[in-house]
Regions:
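Generic short beta-strand segments
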Residues: 47, 90-92, 135-136
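A short, acidic/glycine-rich surface segment
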Residues: 4-6, 94-98
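Long, charged/polar, surface-exposed segments that mediate recognition or autoinhibition
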Residues: 101-103, 122
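Core segments of cupin and vicinal oxygen chelate
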Residues: 23-82, 119, 126, 138-139, ...
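Vicinal oxygen chelate
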Residues: 1-13, 22, 85, 112, ...
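Short, structured motif recognition centered on aromatic/hydrophobic residues
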Residues: 17, 24, 72-77, 82-87, ...
Length: 189
């Protein structure tokens, strides 16, 4: 039986994140990245899905895309036995082909935990991927964490994070209340 994560007056029955969906320009390139670079397990494919009859607005009504958009195919990948990536390739008359930046509305990134950040960064460089800057050392509640962003071949942003000794927030008790008490005690001394 699944344990509900949230309290009353929130989404009933919510137990966690099921999958993350992303759209890519080339499914084979994405499959190579997810399987050969990240080590995901390929699960299965679906599609194509076409709704092109006059008056058929299923795609717009259900997915908020152009009514004539075609979902050419989608692949499912599992990472680390838990996270599922649902990866789409669309053809749409109004398709925007530039990935959003983090500062754009809808901008996003996927953060991946690694045990050895330096080894992971060296691996990404050896794979020919773009790593954005040098690893950053976090401060405050995230003290103990190092992180760096990198780009998938199609420009989607990913982040590597590592905090082998746990973050300060977690060492202080892992709740907002515990962190507030820790911060108050630190500033009082």
């Amino acid at each position: 039986m699944r344990e509900e994560l949230l309290v009353a007056d929130t989404l009933p029955g919510l137990t966690g994140v099921d999958h993350i969906g992303v759209t890519v320009p080339d499914l084979e390139q994405a499959r190579t990245f997810f399987v050969d670079v990240l080590g995901c397990e390929y699960l299965y494919s679906l599609g194509p899905f076409v709704h092109d009859e006059p008056g058929d607005d299923w795609m717009a009504e259900h997915l908020d895309v152009d009514p004539r958009a075609v979902m050419q195919q989608l692949h499912f990948f599992r990472l680390g036995g838990r996270a599922i990536f649902e990866v789409f390739q669309y053809a749409a008359p109004d398709q925007v082909t530039r990935p959003p930046r983090n500062s754009d509305i809808g901008g996003h990134h996927v953060a991946l935990y690694v045990d050895d950040l330096d080894a992971a960064v060296a691996y990404l460089h050896a794979q020919g991927l773009t790593v954005l800057g040098e690893p950053t050392v976090s401060k405050g509640p995230s003290e103990g964490q190092r992180w760096v962003y990198f780009l998938a071949p199609w420009g989607m942003q990913f982040e590597l994070v590592s905090y082998p000794g746990r973050k300060a927030f977690d060492r202080a008790g892992g709740t907002a209340e515990a962190w507030a008490a820790h911060t108050a005690a630190s500033t009082a001394s």
